[in-house]
Amino acid sequence: MSKNKKMSLSGGDTTEKFIYKPKDLIWAKMKGFTPWPGMIVEPPLDLLTQQRRANTKCVFFFGSRNFAWIEENNIKPFEGPWKEELAKVSKPAAFRHAMADIDKYIDDPAEVDDQINESCGVPNHATEADFDKIRDAVDSDENAVDADADANNGVVVHVVGSPDVSEAVEGENNADSSASPTVTAATPATAKSPAKRTPKAKPVSAVSATKAAKASTTKSAQKRRISAHQTPTGANTSGLPNAKRGKRVVSGGATPGNFDGASSSSPTARRRVEVDDLLASLAAKRAPNAIALLDRPVVTRPETQAIDMNSRSNTLADRDIVPSELTFGFLGLGMMGSTIVKDLIYTGHKVVVWNRTIDKCQPFVEAGAEVKDTPMDVVEAADIIFCCVSDPKGAKDLVFGNCGVLQLKDLRNKAYVEMSTVDPDTSLDIGEGIKQCNGRYLEAQIHGSRQEAADGMLIILAGGDRTVFEECHSCFKTIAKNTFFLGNVGNACKVNLILQTIQAVSLVGLAEALALADRFSISLNDIIDIFDLTSMKSPLLLAKGKEMAKGDFNPQQPLSHMQRDLRLVLNMAENLDQSMPVTSITNEVFKHTKRLGYSEHDSSAVFVRSRF
């Protein structure tokens, strides 16, 4: 790597001049990602066919081990005063894995080099050399043909053969192997029509076979005429997929036995054989569709954060919570459910759990919870059953589905609390089903992020049976800082979806504003610092803005959940003929971000769509 060309990396304050060559270790900035450790390499064959901008380099990314074209102004050398700063920009597991991967490469580059060669189909460094070899071969072949024409007084030797004729001759003259249905002609290099020569005498059987074959194959014989300087030896000379090659004899002494190998007196044909073999080997190894699919830049899934049963919230420890004597069932141990159950166990509540993936129940069993095989079993064992799943369909399946809550026909002395984010109609349907089985129903919508749940700082919006609300007081005090009872079933769902709409629209506005600042090359951190001093600030927007600036989209509130809430809001507004144009556009922005691969990332990942 030598200093000569100007280079800059987004987010950096210094610029230096560098020229990069293969095997140089670098930092590369790709759209939607923080600077990532990589290496300059020769492009794989499939990348050579892709359109790319000027002043780009092919970069191999450590960790994910894929390839991409990166502009030189988004590249920095790996070693430098900026290394320590860039290494601290992102902390996800994928980034740590990439750093470990490049350190491993520095110690032992063999394994990564082998993978690069395998991904490319042929060694990367040979790609340009192979192309030059093919180009030089074509040029030398043309020069050789011109030289041969000059040496023969302007006459180029042609080989003319009919596969059908040669097969007929071979069938009649197996005993006489010297018989060959070959016609030799000569063509002046500058003439339009071939010059005529007196043909050599042929055996009688060969002549009769030739006449019989020509009656039906005149056109195909004409199509099969080839010149030695036009078609590589061994190619399909008929121009048809299933045509067979006949034996050919070249005037000058070449026989059918040594023609394919190219006689020592024909360097042009021999060179053509080498080029043909090289092209065939490249085509066989390339597998372009598979390589293009595997080497596309991808969005990695966010790291699944395992529940830490030993962590304790300081806020929760300061609260004076007296656990209820009732047994609480919990259906669903997802991102929010697992955090809530952990806090309930910590505060001394008796909990029975169920989850579709039984492995997620194991940490809670070790902490003192009891696990059941089906939702119906949980209902039998518990007094009050909480449900917290990802969407309305899942919530209804747990109630009305096979082995669901309503499979236990008599829910007398049982209560069901729906904590999943659902629309009012779904909540009413579930409540009606519970009441028909003599049970009590409460909707308790939770508003907040995963971190707020861990800190016990959620907002609970409840509606339905007031007695159930009071019996759940100790649970709500454990997980929430404020609890509101809003009356009839459906009211809490409406309020929760309205709050989610405000949050989603605000996030899209923040993302677009920061994307504009980025286009102006204004530091996003400076924008966030100034925003913190204004009356517009809020803990939510400040936190999301910092995540956008860092490119850290570890899920606190998944983007797919936010888009789900917007969909429910728009359906609810449609039933009322309420116009919501801004919310509709916001929903489309979130849908597009999901399409880009950020469905399971945090809702702040909407910044990626606005920026790029």
From Swiss-Prot:
It is found in: Chromosome. Disulfide bonds: none annotated. SUPFAM superfamilies: 6-phosphogluconate dehydrogenase C-terminal domain-like, NAD(P)-binding Rossmann-fold domains, Tudor/PWWP/MBT. Its main location: nucleus. Residues 168-270 are annotated as: Disordered. One of its GO terms (molecular function) is NAD binding. Residues 276-279 are annotated as: Interaction with histone H3. GO terms for cellular component: chromatin. Residues 22-81 form the PWWP domain. Nucleosome-destabilizing factor that is recruited to genes during transcriptional activation and colocalizes with a subset of trimethylated 'Lys-36' histone H3 (H3K36me3)-enriched regions. Binds DNA (in vitro). Facilitates Pol II transcription through nucleosomes. Facilitates male-specific lethal (MSL) histone acetyltransferase complex targeting to active genes on the X chromosome. Stimulates the acetylation of 'Lys-56' of nucleosomal histone H3 (H3K56ac) by nej. Belongs to the HIBADH-related family. NP60 subfamily. This is Cytokine-like nuclear factor N-PAC. It comes from Drosophila pseudoobscura pseudoobscura (Fruit fly).
